[in-house]
Amino acid sequence: VGSEMCIRDSAYVWRVNVGRISLYLLDTDNEMNSEFDRSITHQLYGGDWENRLKQEILLGIGGILTLKKLGIKKDIYHCNEGHAALINVQRICDYVAEGLTYDQAIELVRASSLYTVHTPVPAGHDYFDEGLFGKYMGGYPSRMGISWDDLMDLGRNNPGDKGERFCMSVFACNTSQEVNGVSWLHGKVSQEMFASIWKGYFPEESHVGYVTNGVHFPTWSATEWKHLYAAHFDENFLYDQSNPKIWEAIYNVSDEEIWKTRMVMKNKLIDYVRKQYRETWLKNQGDPSRIVSLLDKINPNALLIGFGRRFATYKRAHLLFTDLDRLAKIVNNPDYPVQFLFTGKAHPHDGAGQGLIKRIIEISRRPEFLGKIIFLENYDMQLARRLVSGVDIWLNTPTRPLEASGTSGEKALMNGVVNFSVLDGWWLEGYREGAGWALTEKRTYQNQEHQDQLDAATIYSILEQEILPLFYARNKKGYSEGWVKTIKNSIAQIAPHYTMKRQLDDYYDKFYIKEAKRFKMLAADGCAKAKEIAAWKEEVAEKWDSIEVVSCEKTEDLVKGSIESGKEYTITYVIDEKGLNDAIGLELVTTYTAQDGKQHVYSVEPFNVVKKEGNLYTFQAKHKMENAGSFKVSYPVSYTHLRAHETRHDL
């Protein structure tokens, strides 16, 4: 597939069959390219910013060209991360080549595009200098039917600001009708993060929504657990995985069977750990007496806590090691033995993450932690599977609210592993009392070091006072009935809500169906509706500044800014629409000042059109404040086109 850039590159297209789904991979390592360009796809995120831009051009523009070559044309295009945002450049070019104007093409592209943002961390949002971006994208504006400045402005928070770089995430927002985060909290964070794109609106008014991530049950549930579920759950379980009623059957499974399954998986993990540690130690020519001592100390009857993930600094893998004296006391308690398994990798350019791994390894080799703190090398999917199915507790300690979703804990709970996490990402929604443990989502200190110290102390206290006593409250059969109850609660009350099936159902119901209907309407009859809306917007833009507020009537209390709660007030505006014919709407927006000092939306109420006389429209709203307090009120005017748009915004 050749992509028309300033430098023409070619890519092999490889197809991987993932179940019944075809995954297409683009590969520039072929003899048709220069030696330099053959390396574009050698490493994910590899090279400098220029190579990063090449990768994103290949993924976005090359991806659409690949689908065209393969004869694949779909109604909806789902852009995961801003890295793929340039799909909409090529899609606009294709529509313009078919005879549409840019304004008509962007209506079709927006209506059929969904952008999912996966992280609030700045490293996940790429910005490119105008010079570098123009080197490879300079030929595209003419094909899109716009100017170079117009293209750059689509990627800027502040259109017209020549000093602002092109942001892929902003471009994705500006060319997608729907945008979503990957958990409820991340959706809220994303509304704040992207608020500057849609000026004049509060973040809460944004159309940015959410779909909380789930995990693929057949992939991440161990065979032993699949057999248990198959034996006790409804026969249609796999086809109805997100049905909570089916999962409640876990309460009918005997405690002995639950505990036996957990111990089988735990022993498999410990055998794997011993084997890997022995091989790694011998490879590194370590002291044989130390490896023997370490392996002897791994106790299958001890509480086993796992921590495995990418070692980004916001994941706070260091948190457990804040107070080493207290940690040593916990892991060396002869009555309540506990062991920690750590594994993960840091980004090649993340020196802080690599340093953190080094520190954990150094701590694990200290005499008081030998065999109690274990770091496993070569983190991969196989090790991840063993870890999320073999430990007793899955620990997650991100800095709030930087964990967009997280999925490792979801994988663990499918295997009867109990979560202990900060209330961030998916766990903010998933946590149920009696089905796991949580650190509060509220910050106590603005100083991150102080917050880390508090969170670490909380982890130690919950371990000492709640988790360890419950785990070791063993009956005559050798297990804790309270612990098994916690496992059952976790599976019954949380697991059904975090399957991939539920996630896909949410995307289908919230976005795919809505966009498919919208796109079908706009594309029908030679794109007649898209052309109509584009023409309507052009007319509104020409006359917008001439719209005039003729009069405003409010009660005296409203004018003074002091109103009585529970009492209804009437506000009336007369507006001259200057011949736009039902083009505008008026709303009453009430806001309050939160503890963070920011204004937040309390309510949004539409005005009703109660009278029309030529171009004069009389808008009226009846307003009643039910609660006392200090509020601000505004009356924003917006334009509407109800026949084509289901959202308040012109996006």
Spans of model-derived segments:
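Catalytic cores of carbohydrate-active enzymes across secretory and cytosolic contexts
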Residues: V1-E4, R8-R643, R648
